[in-house]
């Protein structure tokens, strides 16, 4: 068993629950978006801006972004821990992934609240 402080959850069960919870959030978000596209009729710029400007859509989008961050981090941590044995390389890859995920969420936050 690897005991490393870079895991997101406290233990494997906690990570398991986080991954399942974020998967549910992402599934609900996909259903929400597909439902919008299926029921919106003609999709114009005004319709799209109106949809993106609603508070519910903004909050749900941010929740989905944070869910992607958590889901991806736990998954990548598990893959890197299992398959990349040199510690320096694994830590460097983890750092790159964390920075990319944080930049992704910050950029998403700016885009969502910029509408």
From Swiss-Prot:
This is Succinate dehydrogenase hydrophobic membrane anchor subunit. Residues 37-58 are periplasmic. It comes from the Bacteria. Its cofactor is heme. It comes from Escherichia coli O157:H7. Keywords: Cell inner membrane, Cell membrane, Electron transport, Heme, Iron, Membrane, Metal-binding, Transmembrane, Transmembrane helix, Transport, Tricarboxylic acid cycle. GO terms for biological process: cytochrome complex assembly; tricarboxylic acid cycle. Residues 1-15, 81-90 are cytoplasmic. It is found in: Cell inner membrane. Heme binds at residue 71. It is a multi-pass membrane protein. The lineage of its organism: Bacteria, Pseudomonadati, Pseudomonadota, Gammaproteobacteria, Enterobacterales. The chain crosses the membrane at residues 16-36, 59-80, 91-115.
